């Protein structure tokens, strides 16, 4: 884990900022200590938490293969543009990040305006400073995914954390918060996002992967309304863009897009897939804090 990211992370026990203590170990001022994995990531889970299902190695591998072939490039470009336009200081926080693919693309486009320190949410610009590159944090419940995310980008740190609980991130640390096909925790999002920050949410629309309906979980037609209801009144909708494109998928591609998400748990391992022309339909929306 990068040392300059640690102050952006919070102890899951007492919520104090983390740092290097006791000869290099990661910990907080109240004496709570956390082991850093050899891959470089941290596990910051609350002591008591609900039993949740995390992505399996098979799901993570399928996602890396599928995204690595560029099939969701329109989403990557849209998120990169949002991050590149961000003006608030702070990190790019990808919640439910998986292996960090979207975060890595976003960081390649990200610079902090006016030379402000890349990770400090409340620092002022040094005299004569120039823009520097953003830092990022990938957060996911899956240790398998986070091990991959720790290697996704040189300017990214990776944390195993529970999206449904208090996020192990200090108040106002995020300039941009990415939520791509992930569960949402609007109370925590409002807490960790900078007052001038942006929340970017990607949700599937009706018709997304429709040609694979027999093998994938269907999209709730009320999903957009439920998104709006879940984020207000803490957030105000700033923009919404519908993206639709056609993907020419090989049999392996179809296997991977089915198995990289929740449908993995509902499809037999020996299912044989055929090449297919498949529609992708998502909404990319941005939201700003109302506080």
Labelled PLM ranges:
Residues 1-53:
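N-terminal auxiliary segments of SAM/dcSAM-dependent transferases
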Residues 196-204:
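Conserved beta-strand signature within the Rossmann-like core of class I S-adenosyl-L-methionine
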Residues 69-88:
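Conserved alpha-helix/loop element of class I SAM-dependent methyltransferases that forms part
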Residues 6, 213-233, 243-291:
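Conserved Class I S-adenosyl-L-methionine
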Residues 93, 99-166:
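Class I SAM-dependent methyltransferase SAM/SAH-binding core
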């Amino acid at each position: 884990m990068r040392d300059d990211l640690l102050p952006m992370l919070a102890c899951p026990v007492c919520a104090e900022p983390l740092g290097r203590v006791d000869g290099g170990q990661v910990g907080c001022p109240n004496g709570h200590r956390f082991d850093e994995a050899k891959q470089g990531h941290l596990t910051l889970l609350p002591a008591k938490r609900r039993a949740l299902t995390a992505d399996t190695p098979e799901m993570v591998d399928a996602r890396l293969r599928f995204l690595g072939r560029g099939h969701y490039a329109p989403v990557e470009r849209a998120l990169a543009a949002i991050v590149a336009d961000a003006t608030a200081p702070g990190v790019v926080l990808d919640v439910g990040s998986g292996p960090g693919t979207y975060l890595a693309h976003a960081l390649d486009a990200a610079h902090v305006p006016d030379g402000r320190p890349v990770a400090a949410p409340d620092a002022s610009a040094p005299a004569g400073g120039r823009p520097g590159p953003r830092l990022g944090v990938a957060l996911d419940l899956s240790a398998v995914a986070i091990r991959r995310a720790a290697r996704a980008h040189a300017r990214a740190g990776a944390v195993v954390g529970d999206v449904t609980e208090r996020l192990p991130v200090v108040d106002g640390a995020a300039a941009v918060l990415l939520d791509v096909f992930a569960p949402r925790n609007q109370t925590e999002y409002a807490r960790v996002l900078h007052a001038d920050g942006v929340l970017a949410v990607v949700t599937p629309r009706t018709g997304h992967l429709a040609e694979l309906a027999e093998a994938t979980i269907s999209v709730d037609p009320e999903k957009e309304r439920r998104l709006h209801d879940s984020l207000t009144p803490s957030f105000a909708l700033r923009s919404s863009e519908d993206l639709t494109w056609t993907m020419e998928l090989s049999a392996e591609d179809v296997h991977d897009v089915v198995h990289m998400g929740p449908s993995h748990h509902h499809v037999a391992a020996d299912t044989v897939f055929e090449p297919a022309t498949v529609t992708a339909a998502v909404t990319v929306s941005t939201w700003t804090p109302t506080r």
